[in-house]
Amino acid sequence: MTKKADPYGFAKDFLAGGISAAVSKTAVAPIERVKLLLQVQAASKQIAVDKQYKGIVDCFVRIPKEQGIGAFWRGNLANVIRYFPTQALNFAFKDVYKQVFLGGVDKNTQFWRYFLGNLGSGGAAGATSLCFVYPLDFARTRLGADVGRGAGEREFNGLLDCLKKTVKSDGIIGLYRGFNVSVQGIIIYRAAYFGCFDTAKGMLPDPKNTSIFVSWAIAQVVTTASGIISYPFDTVRRRMMMQSGRAKSEVMYKNTLDCWVKIGKQEGSGAFFKGAFSNVLRGTGGALVLVFYDEVKALLG
């Protein structure tokens, strides 16, 4: 029998997910920023073609030289602020949607319904959360892509400045640039992220007493696979985010479809996966989120 939702349980999920997300995101912030720069540099007004980063190592070497060591954490505060409600809402809604998708389903006799139910609950949770926090995700991307060294060279002076300038130049819609492809990508990512993880754990002899190392190993595989599958969607959405604040003559992509086509034609299919290896490394943080979530939830009783 599926338990009924209760306010305390929802709040506990929210808190456990948020705490684990904030800790893991701060730990992998340098990798996150390198990945972001490799993804969007071709669409950046600040990075000339001959100054583009050649790869992950080049990016790691040049960032502290050109922007200072603290630049590795540029946009991290915005990322934590964004990630806390995003991840917390994902986990909290995941359990709510589970009741809708998995009510009365026996995992032992109805495996495929159980698997598809987990996919559905994970995807729905991610899409729902995205509606609430997308402007923060947009701001985090633009702050992370800002390569100016001092205040005078920076495009934005912080989270609020980024939001204000974007709304002033593009209106509220400017904060939701790339939203459609983001929803597509988040559903694919979250479906794999939650669906496969919960299904794999559910198939273990004693899921509630699973070793933390086994949980981490399962989570590592899940986050890596789901991250690679959804990576092209992430690249396109971030490229679209880079269009806000530009004059019409400077806009590179007319819409999402145009972005897909131009990246493929002008840069090749490999461009959709720029920074993907750093995303695999970053996936360690995602795996830690899943494991920490279970541990924190257990501590909260």
Swiss-Prot record:
A Pfam short name: Mito_carr
Membrane-traversing stretches: 10-39, 77-101, 112-132, 181-201, 213-233, 276-293
Regulation of this protein's activity per its record: The matrix-open state (m-state) is inhibited by the membrane-permeable bongkrekic acid (BKA). The cytoplasmic-open state (c-state) is inhibited by the membrane-impermeable toxic inhibitor carboxyatractyloside (CATR).
Region described as Important for transport activity: 237-242
UniProt-annotated binding residues for ADP: 82, 94, 237
InterPro entries given in the database record: ADT_euk_type, Mit_carrier, Mitochondrial_sb/sol_carrier, Mt_carrier_dom_sf
Cellular compartments annotated: Mitochondrion inner membrane
Gene Ontology MF annotations: ATP:ADP antiporter activity
Start and stop residues of the Solcar repeats: 8-100, 113-203, 210-299
Coiled coil region boundaries: none
GO CC, any one term: mitochondrial inner membrane
One biological process term in Gene Ontology: mitochondrial ATP transmembrane transport
Family in the record: Belongs to the mitochondrial carrier (TC 2.A.29) family.
Subunit structure, as described in the record: Monomer.
Protein name as catalogued: ADP,ATP carrier protein 1
Organism: Anopheles gambiae
